[in-house]
Regions:
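C-terminal His-loop and adjacent cap/lid subdomain of alpha/beta-hydrolase
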Residues: 1-569
């Protein structure tokens, strides 16, 4: 601990996987990091952070050193809890011939189950006759005749009875308690010593957390559910970085499905995790009159962390990110609390450098813009904010007031090769039954009510790139149109629907003649930049400005400029 900086950096593992070394160290991914490749450039170690992970999610495979948690099941005084549940099954490869259910069915009698299918979210599902499917076992189903593949891109829903729900909300307590132990204790109740001590006292002076995507939504839900206060009423996390995460999770419910993302553009529209409240500050739901906010409980207990919320363009289209900074009806901008920064990463895709969908499922080339430099900048800024009170760089995000946050109907750039999305995912209020506030879902399937929270998206310029937010040089000195969304191809099924978590990139033509041949209105690379030296100088100026404002680290400015110098066309 003598070489440490006093800060614990805790990662909420995404589906049991360790990701902060690839994200913050540009390292090779591994759940058992042991080599120089797994350490990458050593950024976190050079900064002196103590790294911590633990399991919080159940039901994960034991392979690949995933971090898991074993949980008790909930029961009634009279015996097992049995309820009707549902799974949604969507395949993006052509060879899927069996489907694994989240829970074991209490009976393989087909009369007690139902399989439905639809092509698009907006369609009514069709019941698949019992003679066209069967149980393989209590947790697996397949189509008939045996060997029939599930249709790629079709949305299947399977309704069945299950028993013995695990108490998945314990995951929140597992996170709270391990971090509280590391920060405050010298030993646990059994006498096991805390390894993070110095001179017989806890060595940590502050605690930071980060989660990406699913685990970022878990982090927002952790805060919302009041777990940033430990059992001794102390602060758990001093600072948090929820990343590409605008909703919450399907965790603290009976028969939860923690790995679900709701929504995902095509399918997965009816699971908990995207309901009010959306914003960090308290707001009033116009449909129910309920007042609530992500930070309501920690505000009441004076245990809120400082937050840098990092989102991509994908969250606006897929997950209602606009509602984090507007009122629930999308009519006016709101002001995040003083302890929150919103860094909206301009024209960035959720997946960054690692596409989610197999090749061919999305209709356009992937947007692989690397947003990791902004994550590294966020960590250093957050740590400084927590440690000595230096305010983190200001929020940057699209706003209604200046016309940078708009209805999607205003977006239609005339770009060859652009397959325009119908619009962002709608945000209906869902009816899960009268006991949803107790974590009990009594309607399978839930019902989408007529009430709609209005979702807006970032405006774009003549090139099709977003006009507001925190823009990397890839966007301010562009080589093409980068989008946080894409649409599904004919091959991928659900044609025209949003393509999961991937974005699209449509490069500029190299020359004026080339763009005129395709009637591309966007100036070509040759028309924009005299040569690579001109391009590189502009990239350097853009990166230096971000560094000056505190969003980029000097070593990442250097990396970005060196990469630009290698670009040729």
């Amino acid at each position: 601990m003598t070489k440490g900086n006093g800060a614990l950096f805790y990662e909420l593992a995404n589906r049991g996987n360790k990701g902060i070394l690839p994200r913050f160290n540009y390292a090779a991914g591994s759940n058992d990091p042991a080599t120089a490749q797994h350490a990458g450039d050593g950024f976190l170690m050079r900064q002196g952070y103590t790294l911590l992970w633990n399991g919080w999610m159940n039901g994960l495979p034991a392979a690949n050193n995933t971090l898991r948690i074993e949980l008790p099941v909930a029961t009634n005084p009279s015996g097992p809890i049995v309820e009707t549940v549902w799974d949604e099954l969507l395949f993006n490869e052509t060879e899927a011939k069996q489907a694994r259910l989240t829970y074991k069915a209490t009976s393989t009698d087909q009369a007690q189950a139902k399989l439905l299918v639809r092509e698009h979210n907006s369609e009514e599902p069709t019941v698949i006759p019992a003679e066209r499917w069967e149980f393989v076992d209590a947790q697996t189903v397949r189509l008939l005749p045996a060997g029939t593949p599930f249709k790629i891109g079709a949305i299947y829903q399977f309704i069945y009875k299950a028993a013995n729900p695990p108490v998945t909300g314990i995951g929140f307590a597992a996170t709270r308690d391990i971090v509280s132990f590391a920060r405050y204790a010298t030993a646990d109740d059994a006498g096991t010593p805390n390894p993070l001590t110095a001179g017989g006292r806890p060595a940590l002076t502050r605690t930071l957390s980060q989660g990406n995507s699913q685990s970022g939504r878990y982090l927002r839900d952790f805060l919302y559910s009041g777990f940033n206060e430990d059992e001794a009423h102390r602060v758990v996390f001093d600072g948090s970085i929820p990343t590409v995460a605008s909703g919450r999770t399907f965790l603290n419910y009976r028969f939860s499905q923690v790995g679900r993302i709701n929504p995902a553009g095509h399918g997965f529209m009816f699971f908990p995790g995207s309901e009010f409240p959306f914003a960090y500050e308290n707001q009033t739901d116009p449909f129910t009159g309920k007042s609530d906010g992500i930070l309501a409980r920690c505000t009441a207990s004076n245990t809120c962390p400082k937050v840098i919320h990092l989102n991509s363009g994908t969250e606006y289209w897929q997950a209602g990110q606009s509602l984090v900074t507007t009122d629930p009806l999308g009519q006016r901008d709101t002001t995040p609390p003083s302890n929150v920064r919103i860094w909206s990463m301009t024209s960035i895709a959720h997946q960054g450098v690692n596409p989610a969908m197999p090749k061919g499922v999305c209709a356009m080339p992937y947007n692989l813009t690397d947003y990791r430099p902004l994550m590294r900048g966020a960590l250093v800024a957050l740590d400084r904010w927590v440690k000595d009170g230096t305010p983190a760089p200001a929020s940057r995000y699209p706003r209604i007031a200046d016309g940078t946050l708009v209805p999607s109907v205003k977006l239609n750039p005339a770009i060859p090769g652009l397959a325009m999305a119908k619009g962002p995912n709608e945000k209906p209020r869902l009816d899960f039954g009268p006991d949803i506030d107790k974590g009990i879902i009594s309607k399978a399937l839930p019902v989408a009510l007529k009430d709609r929270y209005r979702v807006l998206v970032p405006n774009v310029d003549a090139d099709g790139n977003e006009t507001a937010g925190l823009a990397l040089p890839d966007i301010t000195v562009p080589t093409g149109t980068a989008m946080g969304w894409s649409v599904r191809s004919e091959f991928g099924g659900g044609t025209g629907e949003l393509c999961y978590l991937d974005g699209a990139f449509i490069p500029f033509a190299k020359t004026k003649a080339e763009r005129e041949a395709t009637k591309d209105p966007r100036p070509s690379l040759a028309e924009r930049y005299r040569d690579n030296a001109d391009y590189s100088e502009r990239v350097k100026a853009a990166a230096t400005a971000l560094e000056r404002d505190g969003y980029l680290l000097p070593e990442d400015t250097k990396r970005i400029v060196e990469r630009a110098a290698k670009l040729t066309w």
